[in-house]
Amino acid sequence: MREAVRAGIDVQCLPGATAFVPALVSSGIPCDRFAFEGFLPPKKGRQTKLESLRDEQRTMIFYESPYRLLKTLQQFAEYYGGDRQVSVCREISKVHEESVRGTLDEVITHFTATEPRGEIVIILEGCKK
C-alpha cells in the first residue's frame, strides 16, 4: 500500500464498520501500530491533549469537522513540526471521496486554498525517535 501511494497510484479501500480503517490503510502511513484518538476537545483540554501526544510513536487517528480542520492541522504543525506526514481523508466510500497526503505544511497549504467539506479522518504519523 505504501509503495502504491508513493508511486502516485490512486488507492481506495472498501469501508467497514468504521471510517478510520480504510483511511488508515489508504494513508500510506505505517499502520502496524496506531492509536485512535477520536475528536480532540474543542476548547478545554485541547492543548493538554496535544501536548500529551507529542512523543506518541504510534500512528494517530483523529476525527475532525471541516470547520476545525485547518486549525487542527496548524496546531499539529505547531506541536509536532510541519514535516510530519499526514493524510486527510474525507467522504470515505462516497462519491466525493478524497485523500490528501503529504507533510503537515503541504496539507495545510492545500486546505488553505481548498475549503474542506464532509466527514473527515486525519491520519498523523507518529513521532520518530
Regions found by a protein language model. Give the residues of each.
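Class I SAM-dependent methyltransferase SAM-binding "motif I" and its flanking Rossmann-like core
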Residues: 1-56
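A contiguous loop/helix-start segment that scaffolds small-molecule binding in enzyme catalytic cores
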Residues: 58-129
